[in-house]
């Protein structure tokens, strides 16, 4: 989890924002920024879903189901993020936004909000880790541990 927070903070995802009133963006900038924000909404939703599922998990089957669902959504996030990045990376619009004060402010606001959400999810990942340890003898738990590791590796590669 710590490496995920480090990834979010250090990746320099200068194209991510959440539109806020008061920070004027033209229609093209807003469209690009919204496109980059959409995959992160998927990831935040996946974290929230995992939190709710782990809280109500009563057995290893519930933990496996929760972890599998998180992996499905987190992998969807990676796929959608990569598609957006391929579409816009290196474009003139993205380059122009690097020098736009309003775009930078939107990016800062989004990154601050995202950082808070990711830091708040630390307890969820700690609870998941505890549940995975508690049911470690289950073959399905071992499978889902491997799947979680692969998924987290994909998430970390988003920055590349």
List the predicted regions and their residue ranges.
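Long, amphipathic, charge-rich alpha-helical segments that form helical bundles/coiled-coils
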Residues: 36, 70-143, 147
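Immediate post-signal-peptide N-terminus of mature secreted/exported proteins
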Residues: 22-75, 152-160
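Detector for intrinsically disordered, low-structure N-terminal pre-sequences
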Residues: 4, 13-14, 31, 62, ...
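C-terminal segment of classical bacterial N-terminal signal peptides
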Residues: 14-22
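Bacterial N-terminal signal peptides that target proteins for export
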Residues: 1-9
